[in-house]
């Protein structure tokens, strides 16, 4: 309620002074870059939301997942612990249907198809954007059309030569050290080291139990280094990440301090990507090269149960190349793109065979713009073939999407249809004892109708949508309770509404979002779980961010509400997870070369969990000092 009161007082003031503000936004500084980004976003036909640099700096957030959770239609799965894996799900389509792109190049994981957003820092980003379906612009790669939803991470280009250093200390013995050197507008080098003990207390209470304990085996040590070079139309981005962490596991009733998970994980990730884009009159060209090398080592050694002992290393590589060309004539444009990806996976598991995959995609897009009308249609052809012992059959598929919008003054009416699929991952097909080489692709279809309003200080988006997922890939017991296998089983449908509001006035920025969705299981009309809610899909969720920027001061208050969620496929088996509300605050002040920031997350110390029996931290603090030379 207190956040609503802030909104009710600030928004009328915005309306009263909107035209004066509009004149001020021609000034180029960090405070007013929000409007610049939003203006560019209105050129896209598909629904989209953006968090800009000004909001990123003011948020009490540490990684990309912390920023995305405030966007409409987004669900974050956080597997507890300060170093727990964080994946994103958009409109209940599944995390493997969400493509994450860094400067237009996809971050991939051929092994399991998901991206851990906790590994990617916000410190080097200019903006984080979410597009339902995909962007609608020339020179997109074919891979960008292959996702049901897309997240774009835009790297921040430096504007001067500077050395930035920072140190942060927070709850649970959390230390962060950051160093960034930028040279003119040519590029930067950014490094960060993080350590946390992660031993936060928790209280888990249900109708049947009341458990109090301390999270064990939740420590994390991680180091990240990345650089980016800008040379005219050329951009070269290199990323390196290494971590050593504990995997705390789900809590055990009344025994949380006696039986501690001992799983440990070592991660090492590297990629280097080179992209070039230029225009020659009506022609446009784009080329991309990328190489990635990822290694994961997992070990668990339970003294009291040797049957679950594990010590395995996974190694995967990825090489990617793409070329796109576009041509425009008056109101018509055409774009052709083709890319090729080579991925391989090795593991020191018994009976595991080396496998590599060749994945080729080709897309043809047609754009038409006339006055306020914008039309776009794309056809995508995918060919995928694996090479290993007893390999799965090659895959050939054609999918398409169509988008349309009409703009009249400040109003835009839009709609899109998109059909796309995900290829079974290498784990789905070949994982020892569980993989199934006969799996079919998992298809999604989406229909969206919405409108947007954009005028001076205010932007509003409202969308209604329908989607369904066919042939869901799930792991089910096939030969008794001790033999599980990957199967195509499941049909779900989702009806939803997304609302987002952005308002900017002088020193105030307000961002509101809300989602309603009805996501149901429609697999087997005779089954007990037919028409039950899909696991971890809340019906209602809301978020609000208020940011204040004035001279050297910055402050933000963010609040997020998530409705109750069922966590079992059959809703009657157990009670749903409780709804939760989480509030974060952050205050900062900059004087010349020094910035001091203080933040508090989960201000009211509300216990909650995103995943069943994976409690999240309660109230926690952090103080940060930053130096600029």
Predicted regions and their residues:
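Extracytoplasmic beta-strand/coil segments of soluble accessory domains associated
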Residues: 65-109
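C-terminal beta-signal and adjacent terminal beta-strands/loops
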Residues: 468-470, 561-570, 576, 588-629
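A beta-strand signature from Gram-negative outer-membrane beta-barrel systems
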Residues: 122-162
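Short, acidic, small-residue-rich periplasmic hinge/interaction motif at the N-terminus
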Residues: 17-57, 95, 132
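Periplasmic-side early beta-strands and strand-to-turn transitions of outer-membrane beta-barrels
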Residues: 136, 152, 160, 182-265
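Outer-membrane beta-barrel signature, preferentially recognizing the C-terminal barrel domain
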Residues: 260-279, 392-394, 399, 403, ...
């Amino acid at each position: 309620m207190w956040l609503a009161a802030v909104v009710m007082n600030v928004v009328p003031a915005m309306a009263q002074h909107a035209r004066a503000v509009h004149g001020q936004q021609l000034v180029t500084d960090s405070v007013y870059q929000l409007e610049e980004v939003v203006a560019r976003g209105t050129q896209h036909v598909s629904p989209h939301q953006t968090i800009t640099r000004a909001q990123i700096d003011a948020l009490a957030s540490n990684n990309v997942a912390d920023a995305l959770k405030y966007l409409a239609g987004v669900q974050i799965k956080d597997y507890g612990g300060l170093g727990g894996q964080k994946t994103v799900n958009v409109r209940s389509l599944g995390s493997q249907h969400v493509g994450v792109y860094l400067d237009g190049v996809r971050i991939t994981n051929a092994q399991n198809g998901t991206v851990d957003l906790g590994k990617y820092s916000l410190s080097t980003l200019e903006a984080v954007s979410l597009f339902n379906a995909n962007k609608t612009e020339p020179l997109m790669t074919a891979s960008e059309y292959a996702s049901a939803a897309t997240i774009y991470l835009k790297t921040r280009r430096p504007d001067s030569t500077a050395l930035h250093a920072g140190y942060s200390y927070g709850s649970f013995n959390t230390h962060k050290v950051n160093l960034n050197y930028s040279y003119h507008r040519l590029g930067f080098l950014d490094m960060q080291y993080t350590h946390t003990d992660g031993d936060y207390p928790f209280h888990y209470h249900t109708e049947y139990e009341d458990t109090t304990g301390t999270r064990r085996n939740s420590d994390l040590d991680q180091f990240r280094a990345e650089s980016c070079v800008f040379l005219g139309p050329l951009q070269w981005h290199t990323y390196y990440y290494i971590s050593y962490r504990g995997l705390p596991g789900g809590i055990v009733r009344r025994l949380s301090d006696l039986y501690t998970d001992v799983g440990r994980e070592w991660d090492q990730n590297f990629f280097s990507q080179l992209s070039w884009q230029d225009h020659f009159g009506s022609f446009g060209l784009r080329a991309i090269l990328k190489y990635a090398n990822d290694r994961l080592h997992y070990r668990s050694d339970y003294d009291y149960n040797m049957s679950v002992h594990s010590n395995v290393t996974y190694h995967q590589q990825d090489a990617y190349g793409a070329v796109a060309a576009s041509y425009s004539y008056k109101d018509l444009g055409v774009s052709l793109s083709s890319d090729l990806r080579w991925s391989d996976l090795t593991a020191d598991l018994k009976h595991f065979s080396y496998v590599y995959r060749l994945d080729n995609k080709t897309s043809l897009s047609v754009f038409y713009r006339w006055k306020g009308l914008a039309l776009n249609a794309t056809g995508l052809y995918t060919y995928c073939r694996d090479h290993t012992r007893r390999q799965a059959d090659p895959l050939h598929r054609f999918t398409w999407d169509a988008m349309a919008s009409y703009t009249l003054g400040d109003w835009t009416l839009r709609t899109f249809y998109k059909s796309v699929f995900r290829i079974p991952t290498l784990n789905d097909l070949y994982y020892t004892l569980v993989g199934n080489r006969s799996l079919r692709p998992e298809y999604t279809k989406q229909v969206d109708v919405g409108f947007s309003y954009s005028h001076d200080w205010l932007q509003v988006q409202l969308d209604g949508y329908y989607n369904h997922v066919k042939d869901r890939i799930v792991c089910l017991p096939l030969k008794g309770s001790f033999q599980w296998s990957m199967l195509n089983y499941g049909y779900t449908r989702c009806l939803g509404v997304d609302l987002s509001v952005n308002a900017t006035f002088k020193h105030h920025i307000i961002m509101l979002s809300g989602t309603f969705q009805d996501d149901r299981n429609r697999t087997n009309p005779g089954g007990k779980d037919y028409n039950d809610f899909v696991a971890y899909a809340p019906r209602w969720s809301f978020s609000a961010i208020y940011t204040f920027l004035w001279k050297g001061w910055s402050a933000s208050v963010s609040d997020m509400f998530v409705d109750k969620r069922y966590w079992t496929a059959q809703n009657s088996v157990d009670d749903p997870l409780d709804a939760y509300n989480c509030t974060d605050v952050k205050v900062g002040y900059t004087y010349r070369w020094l910035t001091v920031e203080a933040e508090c997350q989960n201000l009211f110390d509300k216990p909650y969990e995103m995943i069943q029996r994976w409690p999240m931290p309660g109230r926690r603090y952090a103080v940060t000092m930053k130096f600029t030379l």
